[in-house]
Curated annotation (Swiss-Prot):
The gene is MT-CYB. This is Cytochrome b. It is found in: Mitochondrion inner membrane. It comes from Balaenoptera brydei. Signal peptide: none annotated. Component of the ubiquinol-cytochrome c reductase complex (complex III or cytochrome b-c1 complex) that is part of the mitochondrial respiratory chain. The b-c1 complex mediates electron transfer from ubiquinol to cytochrome c. Contributes to the generation of a proton gradient across the mitochondrial membrane that is then used for ATP synthesis. GO terms for molecular function: metal ion binding; ubiquinol-cytochrome-c reductase activity. InterPro entries: Cyt_b/b6_C (IPR005798), Cyt_b/b6_C_sf (IPR036150), Cyt_b/b6_N (IPR005797), Cytb/b6-like_sf (IPR027387), Cytochrome_b (IPR030689), Cytochrome_b_C_euk/bac (IPR048260), Cytochrome_b_N_euk/bac (IPR048259), Di-haem_cyt_TM (IPR016174). A ubiquinone binds at residue 201. Heme b b562 binds at residues 83, 182.
Amino acid sequence: MTNIRKTHPLMKIVNDVFVDLPTPSNISSWWNFGSLLGLCLITQILTGLFLAMHYTPDTTTAFSSVAHICRDVNYGWVIRYLHANGASMFFICLYAHMGRGLYYGSYAFRETWNIGVILLFTVMATAFMGYVLPWGQMSFWGATVITNLLSAIPYIGTTLVEWIWGGFSVDKATLTRFFAFHFILPFIILALAMVHLIFLHETGSNNPTGIPSDMDKIPFHPYYTTKDILGALLLILTLLMLTLFVPDLLGDPDNYTPANPLSTPTHIKPEWYFLFAYAILRSIPNKLGGVLALLLSILILALIPMLHTSKQRSMMFRPFSQFLFWVLIADLLTLTWIGGQPVEHPYVIVGQFASILYFLLILVLMPVTSLIENKLMKW
């Protein structure tokens, strides 16, 4: 008799994803991040659910309700900090996952890659709205500054901003709708992640060499379930270390001051995972130009499959492209650092150089280098 996992309509789906999935035999630990992102998402949904049971989305009580969660709710402080630091872990895994895709040419799976870009936008929107909810100083001013960027859109900008705010400033209506969106978006992310997987399983996984591996596949279970559990344990360990030892390491002290529309913080900045984009936004002295650069810095990812000029898929055997890839990573780290610095010399000029280099690398240097490598291969 056939095993029930292969015949039962629901178990068959799970089986095809986690058990009998043919997987390349040579994928490295960089392929762990997909499952880790799934784990992060489940953790965030669960901790978020318990936080929502005690949180009140009202300007007068939001800050107090977060303090109440931390002080009076059983293990409320653990849930709150798991959720806050879980977001940081989510983005670490997300950026590692994208870096892997860039390095090994996984973007050649166009549908999977494009759904991934949409997922990135959705996760960024969710994280931004979540940051507004504690209603601290940085929550309020972050929401004001970022939503205000939409006013740069010609003709409809101001109307659009006031429509999003639900009034003439960030207020009760804004907080309520942000809470509603912050609650629903993770479930949309979950659905999109399933679509992401469906598209991936149409083609099968890529591998470090970028060469088709149809002749050398192994079942996902037990090989990669075991490998993924190791990654999951390391992720959980890191998250617990952050939460229990340095819960505020990645946060902003300003957010422990209740929101005050009459007092602007000295330096308004988003969470660390948005700083690279924030630095690109600030490096252009024109409002509309900055907003466009900010959008393009993420949207450029959708162009990457079209910018691939190499005859090889992966960068594994392309040393010049590898060098430029690591320059790009260094550039993004520089932008992240600049985004957290005040707007003064020399940070402004460094940020402008780093922003130009970011676009130059992706749009010009990497495609041209790939063409040169193609020529060198003929020698």
